[in-house]
């Protein structure tokens, strides 16, 4: 291999390894009075969407004030998480339901 080929190979390698830079979204299904998955991990700037597949109304309510509001069966709501941290949430109607969003 010629020495001049090394920089080209390095550029190709780094391009192949690099991501798009966009934060990948996550989805949380609500079914059988549970958040599935109970914990999601996303990068800062990502959207998390809650989809209610249950017969009862539910929320994803955070202490910080973020809230999906009441979601009836088939409803969905996305929230965007800008700052790294761990964000626990509960259903305002069913306190035994809880989940967590981990933002890296």
Predicted regions and their residues:
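Extracytoplasmic copper-binding redox domains, predominantly the cupredoxin/blue-copper superfamily
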Residues: 6, 10-104
């Amino acid at each position: 291999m010629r020495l001049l080929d090394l920089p080209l190979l390095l550029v190709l390698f780094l391009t192949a390894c690099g991501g798009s830079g966009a934060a990948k979204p996550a989805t949380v299904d609500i079914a059988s009075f549970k958040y599935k998955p109970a914990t999601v991990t996303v990068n800062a700037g990502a959207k998390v969407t809650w989809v209610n597949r249950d017969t009862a109304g539910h929320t994803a309510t955070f202490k910080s004030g973020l809230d999906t509001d009441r979601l009836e069966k088939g409803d969905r709501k996305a929230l965007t998480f800008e700052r790294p941290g761990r964000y626990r949430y509960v259903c305002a109607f069913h306190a035994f339901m809880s989940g967590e969003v981990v933002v890296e």
